Amino acid sequence: MSRIIINADDCGYSQKVNSHIEAAIKQERISSTTIMANMDDFEGAIRLYNEHCSHISFGFHMNMTEGSPLTYSQELLDLGFFKEVEGKIVLNGNPYRRKVLSKSARQAIYSEVLTQAHKIMDSGVQFSHIDSHHFMHQAVFMIPMLPKLCKELGVAKVRNYRNYMPNGLNKSIRTLWAKMIRTQNSKIIFPDVFVDYQYFYECYAKGIIYHKEDDCIELMCHPGGIYTEEEALLMNTDCEEKFNCKLINYNEL
């Protein structure tokens, strides 16, 4: 029987997002969520952790693409990774995900990510795993940094690359990413499969199966966000009954 983790991204993004995540927790529709350090309702995310950490997992949602950074770097401003908008410095990492950056730029980015993590940990959160906003933990410049971050934070579990697809070149390339990370830190654990909730739901409904019977599958969702159709499916579906699986969290992986 497959094991499924349903992770709600963006905990802390806003009061609306947090309220929808809390509803999904209470209805047992998700088993995990990941916290952002620099968005509008960080305090609400910490409240959710304190109230629900006994039965779902809480990870670190590193953010390099939205909101204000927690550190200052003139180099990242000059590069454009940090950007000034209407007198406010904001994160702008998305255009750089496939670029090779200088050592000093990577160090400045690492400092920002570490500061985000420590802000959450200093509020009493014990991370179950690491993922990221807009998949930035999969950026080229993060490949040498992610194993180091895992070691420094004492976290061994990381979201996999989106790999729910037929076997072929594209899937092989995505599998290579995980192998490159493991080469640098053999203790890192990934779920076998990662895909968004709605795509998995629709494939399953059509009998399209790309996973093995004993795989651990992470399904990503965004309660309170723009994906209202996906959220409706999530909130009206008993995962274990629908997908013939066991619902687990990252602490059980």
Stretches with model-predicted labels:
Residues 2-5, 15-124, 129, 137-253:
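Terminal accessory/targeting
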Residues 8-12:
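DG-centered beta-turn motif at the end of beta-strands
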Residues 132:
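Active-site histidine-anchored catalytic micro-motif
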